[in-house]
């Protein structure tokens, strides 16, 4: 086993040859490299599969031995400074490595077909492999310097992949927004690292924690300075994991290809902030108020992400806000000290959300045959509906991921979210109420996405995308609007017009929207073209990863079932995390009383089903359930209560669709303020500073010219002017200094 750990340093570098060889091939042999481009997809999958096998083997060793391994060697040594590099293999490392590799392999297989038509196919796989190297290097790092190096490389990969279609202005702006927002957190992370190095004199985790704990025990540190450094460290995690208030980049990051959203912005990169907090939890727990700050940021993000997901019309942005909310649950768990629950939810959410994103990619892929390549249309849930008949396999797997995220047993997220909800009662009743209420909101907005996408009829075939022109409560344009519209149900209505809970806005279609050429599935069928008027199911190379992730969603929750049976321990996750400490309630074993478990489970599932029921009531097409027509019609009738209810709903949806006006606030006050300062600085530099410099020259020139014309070349004039200057100088001197 010792020999196996000795070779673990190679894990981050195994995927690295792919981007290097692709780059060299495009420079030296561009034609041949492009001709055999699909070979590089195979190479990427093969190398990442090797890492996966290695990671699984190390994880088995971790579970059996309940230990960790660290190897460090000195890179620079002198009398005053030594920099050490190495790698650390512990339960947290092995969990993250398996997540990165398993989800990464599925995404790479999926991308081979999804990106087959794209001219940037090779560039895509080069970026993805380089991201795998960066992320694996991050999770195996043994000190803060290595963490920061790979942290920046991960941010670079995110920038490149979000802006993959950089010719689209929206994508270019999105990658810049993500880059700048993450730079704010990264700058804080760097300052925090330097601050703690100044305190402890070490970057390496074990020495760092030991020295710092001794300093705290002996009361030899300035708690104000230590708290500031800890907040700066936490700022890096806040930005990377899209926590409030640095969450604004994540929804715009959906401008990249959908496989990127599945791997980077759902399962791995956004989990880097959670990983950092989990890695530094022994540090944070001994600093006053930091753990409470982490939990506060987590609970705010939980609620904010869920409410902002309520009114999104873009399927990927809805899933992005869902990711933000679920990451908030993990951050809340870490702030409460529930280390096991946070990592458990990290595992289950990664597979469920990757399944949902790949499913949304399959939906978008099929919609492009009708509406064309336009993200504003192919990702618009208002143009979908009734897809269950056209993409049945995608529908089943998407429903599986939806129910998992809703917290329906026995799917994966039920087990992990239930633990966090139960632990929240031990920490704070207020936080618990918010967390449980948000669980209901999660079920509501996730089932809303499912119903708008798969139920009813294909809305793109209707003139107003609603099926019936004169049925206001049937239209499913409940998410908001593209711009400011006087008659939008999400804005204040005119006094002489009635308010409707559902929008009646009509969206025009392109004339040739229904007749599109089907993109090729494989190179062998490149010349095959067919015209489709309805969406079609994706190719097997896209369905296979979705199916595998569906299996993970079904069974991965069994890793952490929180009860034991006589004669055998079923809680594999607890054995896996045995070297770590559950800071919330340390127990000799992780068994749970069946009665307590069932009581909590019944309550959480009831809340989830209530959210599903409300979503079904509001979004399920009425013609599929005519029995409820009179009930729905009773809610549509006008009256004082109805008008008040509409105003409340319109306000909520307007607030949600406009992202709680946080982006607008940043744009107006931060971006606008910085732009105004830059313009003022430019004006001051060009007009004032340059004006003073140029003014001296101009004045000297004018004075010289004046003297030249006044003197006229006569000596008597020069003597007169000279005496006049002397007399003026003496007069000024007398007036100023005569009092002294």
From Swiss-Prot:
<keyword id="KW-0813">Transport</keyword>
<dbReference type="GO" id="GO:0048038">
    <property type="term" value="F:quinone binding"/>
</dbReference>
<keyword id="KW-0812">Transmembrane</keyword>
<feature type="transmembrane region" description="Helical">
    <location>
        <begin position="219"/>
        <end position="239"/>
    </location>
</feature>
<dbReference type="Pfam" id="PF00361">
    <property type="entry name" value="Proton_antipo_M"/>
</dbReference>
<dbReference type="InterPro" id="IPR018393">
    <property type="entry name" value="NADHpl_OxRdtase_5_subgr"/>
</dbReference>
<dbReference type="InterPro" id="IPR001516">
    <property type="entry name" value="Proton_antipo_N"/>
</dbReference>
<protein>
    <recommendedName>
        <fullName>NAD(P)H-quinone oxidoreductase subunit 5, chloroplastic</fullName>
        <ecNumber>7.1.1.-</ecNumber>
    </recommendedName>
</protein>
<feature type="transmembrane region" description="Helical">
    <location>
        <begin position="147"/>
        <end position="167"/>
    </location>
</feature>
<feature type="transmembrane region" description="Helical">
    <location>
        <begin position="543"/>
        <end position="563"/>
    </location>
</feature>
<comment type="similarity">
    <text>Belongs to the complex I subunit 5 family.</text>
</comment>
<feature type="transmembrane region" description="Helical">
    <location>
        <begin position="125"/>
        <end position="145"/>
    </location>
</feature>
<keyword id="KW-0874">Quinone</keyword>
<feature type="transmembrane region" description="Helical">
    <location>
        <begin position="425"/>
        <end position="445"/>
    </location>
</feature>
<keyword id="KW-0934">Plastid</keyword>
<keyword id="KW-0618">Plastoquinone</keyword>
<dbReference type="Pfam" id="PF00662">
    <property type="entry name" value="Proton_antipo_N"/>
</dbReference>
<feature type="transmembrane region" description="Helical">
    <location>
        <begin position="258"/>
        <end position="278"/>
    </location>
</feature>
<keyword id="KW-0472">Membrane</keyword>
<dbReference type="GO" id="GO:0009535">
    <property type="term" value="C:chloroplast thylakoid membrane"/>
</dbReference>
<keyword id="KW-1278">Translocase</keyword>
<keyword id="KW-0520">NAD</keyword>
<dbReference type="InterPro" id="IPR003945">
    <property type="entry name" value="NU5C-like"/>
</dbReference>
<feature type="transmembrane region" description="Helical">
    <location>
        <begin position="327"/>
        <end position="347"/>
    </location>
</feature>
<feature type="transmembrane region" description="Helical">
    <location>
        <begin position="40"/>
        <end position="60"/>
    </location>
</feature>
<feature type="transmembrane region" description="Helical">
    <location>
        <begin position="286"/>
        <end position="306"/>
    </location>
</feature>
<comment type="subunit">
    <text>NDH is composed of at least 16 different subunits, 5 of which are encoded in the nucleus.</text>
</comment>
<feature type="transmembrane region" description="Helical">
    <location>
        <begin position="354"/>
        <end position="374"/>
    </location>
</feature>
<feature type="transmembrane region" description="Helical">
    <location>
        <begin position="89"/>
        <end position="109"/>
    </location>
</feature>
<dbReference type="InterPro" id="IPR001750">
    <property type="entry name" value="ND/Mrp_TM"/>
</dbReference>
<feature type="transmembrane region" description="Helical">
    <location>
        <begin position="185"/>
        <end position="205"/>
    </location>
</feature>
<dbReference type="InterPro" id="IPR002128">
    <property type="entry name" value="NADH_UbQ_OxRdtase_chlpt_su5_C"/>
</dbReference>
<keyword id="KW-0150">Chloroplast</keyword>
<feature type="transmembrane region" description="Helical">
    <location>
        <begin position="396"/>
        <end position="416"/>
    </location>
</feature>
<dbReference type="GO" id="GO:0015990">
    <property type="term" value="P:electron transport coupled proton transport"/>
</dbReference>
<keyword id="KW-0521">NADP</keyword>
<dbReference type="GO" id="GO:0008137">
    <property type="term" value="F:NADH dehydrogenase (ubiquinone) activity"/>
</dbReference>
<feature type="transmembrane region" description="Helical">
    <location>
        <begin position="602"/>
        <end position="622"/>
    </location>
</feature>
<comment type="function">
    <text>NDH shuttles electrons from NAD(P)H:plastoquinone, via FMN and iron-sulfur (Fe-S) centers, to quinones in the photosynthetic chain and possibly in a chloroplast respiratory chain. The immediate electron acceptor for the enzyme in this species is believed to be plastoquinone. Couples the redox reaction to proton translocation, and thus conserves the redox energy in a proton gradient.</text>
</comment>
<dbReference type="GO" id="GO:0042773">
    <property type="term" value="P:ATP synthesis coupled electron transport"/>
</dbReference>
<feature type="transmembrane region" description="Helical">
    <location>
        <begin position="9"/>
        <end position="29"/>
    </location>
</feature>
<feature type="transmembrane region" description="Helical">
    <location>
        <begin position="717"/>
        <end position="737"/>
    </location>
</feature>
